């Protein structure tokens, strides 16, 4: 059994080679003034539980979880935060002193902190449109609600899935093609940008939009953000700040140190 001298962390996914988490967490460690290990672990489909068990048995202190294992991580955890219970998914595993695993979900914190602290746009009292009804959107709704927006509307190509989330969280649902009216904040949680696609929404909904936000980052966010900008959105942003923000919240849960996300966002932009 190999034990490690430094505090050891990892991100589990499949695929995971593209993950920027190691660079982000090493920047956090520099802020704290400590040395850590942070690695990418590509778990086999069907082998996630064993991979996590091996990691923690050999000195792992905490782990991030990305697709496709967030729901499996939820079931693997011995206890859960309220956020994780509401989201039904876990992106952060914390190894407790009693040997148990605690599951949390920091995606919503990452999104909300990026919008309110980095982009300087208040969520309280605003109208929010969420595009998509998958796990990414479900994971952020609980924290968005904590910020007390005036209204949250979820729009999805398949109405039934949107209505399921609407009933679960006490928000509104509409078919994507029927979206109308202005929104202060429009958040794209669909994955269409990976294929160059944008959600089937009318351009006039961006006329009074203070922020159009895509939860993915880089080239995949460009189609939606270009469309939003051309349609009148005052400000646009990809999900890099959300990525760094959720990582910072995970780091704080593991180590009790809250990193400053702003310089790390700038560092990641420069890579």
From Swiss-Prot:
MF (Gene Ontology): NADP binding; shikimate 3-dehydrogenase (NADP+) activity
Keywords, ordered alphabetically: Amino-acid biosynthesis, Aromatic amino acid biosynthesis, NADP, Oxidoreductase
Chain positions recorded as NADP(+) binding sites: 82, 132-136, 156-161, 215, 239
EC number annotated for this UniProt entry: 1.1.1.25
One of the GO BP terms on file: shikimate metabolic process
Pfam families given in the database record: SDH_C, Shikimate_DH, Shikimate_dh_N
Family per record: Belongs to the shikimate dehydrogenase family.
Binding partners and assembly: Homodimer.
Reported function: Involved in the biosynthesis of the chorismate, which leads to the biosynthesis of aromatic amino acids. Catalyzes the reversible NADPH linked reduction of 3-dehydroshikimate (DHSA) to yield shikimate (SA).
Protein name listed in UniProt: Shikimate dehydrogenase (NADP(+))
Organismal lineage: Bacteria, Pseudomonadati, Pseudomonadota, Betaproteobacteria, Neisseriales
The gene coding this protein: aroE
């Amino acid at each position: 059994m190999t034990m490690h001298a430094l505090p050891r962390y990892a991100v589990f996914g499949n695929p995971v080679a593209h993950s920027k988490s190691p660079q982000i967490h090493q920047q956090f460690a520099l802020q704290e003034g400590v040395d850590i290990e942070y690695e990418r672990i590509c778990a086999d489909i069907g082998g996630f539980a064993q991979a996590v068990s091996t990691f923690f048995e050999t000195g792992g202190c905490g782990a991030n979880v990305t697709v496709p294992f967030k729901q499996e991580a939820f079931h693997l955890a011995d206890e859960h935060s309220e956020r994780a219970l509401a989201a039904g998914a876990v992106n952060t595993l914390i190894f407790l002193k009693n040997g148990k695993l605690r599951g949390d979900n920091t995606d919503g914190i990452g999104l909300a902190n990026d919008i309110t602290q980095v982009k300087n746009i208040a969520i309280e009292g605003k109208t929010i449109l969420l595009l998509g009804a998958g796990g990414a959107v479900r994971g952020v709704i609980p924290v968005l609600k904590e910020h007390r927006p005036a209204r949250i509307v979820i729009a999805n190509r398949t109405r039934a899935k949107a209505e399921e989330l609407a009933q679960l969280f006490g928000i509104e649902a509409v078919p994507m093609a029927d979206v109308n009216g202005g929104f202060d904040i429009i958040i794209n949680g669909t994955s269409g940008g990976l294929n160059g696609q944008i959600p089937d929404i009318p351009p006039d909904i961006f006329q009074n939009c203070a922020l159009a936000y895509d939860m993915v980052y880089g080239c995949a966010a460009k189609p939606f953000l270009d469309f939003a900008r051309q349609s009148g959105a005052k400000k646009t942003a990809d999900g890099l700040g959300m990525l760094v923000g959720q990582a910072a919240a995970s780091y704080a849960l593991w180590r009790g140190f809250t990193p400053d996300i702003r310089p790390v966002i700038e560092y990641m932009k420069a890579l």
